[in-house]
Amino acid sequence: MFLLYEYDIFWAFLIISSVIPILAFRISGLLAPTSKGPEKLSSYESGIEPMGDAWLQFRIRYYMFALVFVVFDVETIFLYPWALSFDILGVSVFIEALIFVLILVLGLVYAWRKGALEWS
């Protein structure tokens, strides 16, 4: 028999954890000043006035390295529990993990051929 009162704590937690942030945003919106002075509209760089043009564009060269790192970091997170329970899971899960690693290796080869791993 399915009893709904077993989930009362869950629903109370869900409602309270949803209402508190909404109330915080509403109250801060009511109490915050609406006029924006020149200090609010100026650029801010480490507590000092910016020298020159504050909207200078620059290229980030290592973002592809960071993306490839994140992909393989997530791979490690997925494969670690699998490696710990390898003897229990069986051959079918081993084949699934090999397919997962193969897809990631194909992604690495693609990134390598596109030049994502070159620092230029």
UniProtKB/Swiss-Prot annotation:
GO terms for biological process: photosynthesis, light reaction. InterPro entries: NAD(P)H_OxRDtase_bac/plastid, NADH_UbQ/plastoQ_OxRdtase_su3, NDAH_ubi_oxred_su3_sf. It holds the Pfam family Oxidored_q4. It catalyses: a plastoquinone + NADH + (n+1) H(+)(in) = a plastoquinol + NAD(+) + n H(+)(out); a plastoquinone + NADPH + (n+1) H(+)(in) = a plastoquinol + NADP(+) + n H(+)(out). The chain crosses the membrane at residues 2-22, 64-84, 88-108. GO terms for molecular function: NADH dehydrogenase (ubiquinone) activity; quinone binding. It is a multi-pass membrane protein. Coiled coil: none annotated. Its main location: plastid. Its EC number is 7.1.1.-. It is found in: Plastid, Chloroplast thylakoid membrane. Keywords: Chloroplast, Membrane, NAD, NADP, Plastid, Plastoquinone, Quinone, Thylakoid, Translocase, Transmembrane, Transmembrane helix, Transport. GO terms for cellular component: chloroplast thylakoid membrane; NADH dehydrogenase complex. NDH shuttles electrons from NAD(P)H:plastoquinone, via FMN and iron-sulfur (Fe-S) centers, to quinones in the photosynthetic chain and possibly in a chloroplast respiratory chain. The immediate electron acceptor for the enzyme in this species is believed to be plastoquinone. Couples the redox reaction to proton translocation, and thus conserves the redox energy in a proton gradient. Belongs to the complex I subunit 3 family. NDH is composed of at least 16 different subunits, 5 of which are encoded in the nucleus. This is NAD(P)H-quinone oxidoreductase subunit 3, chloroplastic.
